[in-house]
Amino acid sequence: FRRKIIIKVPQRKKYAVIDVFAGPGGLNEGFVQRDNIFGPFVSIEKDSVSCRTLKVRKIYHLLKNSKKKNSDYIEFISNQSNLDEFLDLPKHNKLKSIIDNSIWNHELGALDSKKTAKEIKKRLKNQGWDEKKGDGVIIIGGPPCQAYSIAGRSRRSQMIKSGEYNPH
């Protein structure tokens, strides 16, 4: 006589991640790698080049475990298609929707805070986040890197010319 024991494991709660001043996504990367706990994601970045990098990384993470789709990614990375052409292919409609909701090329402060919050919620909901079910949210981000920003370099060159620059 065998007895079957069924253990119900509660589903682990997932936390949406809002990455402000995302840059190319370095801080976000660790959270993305733990997608069993964290997700969906909204990365907010004002620099369009950094947003392109975020999109390429998002494509990589979405396709890396799919053998069929992995060949699409390899084709894309091999420069046989550009990012827009790749995402505009009908077979990538779902992928494009995720990318469009995950990455927001936007300067924080350009809209009032209520409009910004509404847009972020919309993007999270479009990816399956449900505030009413108690889905959590984590906000990550850091200040813009002044040492490498265009404004920071310009300001430093002016300080050097005027003798005000002190690197220590």
Language model: regions and residue ranges:
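Conserved active-site and SAM-binding loop architecture
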Residues: 1-168
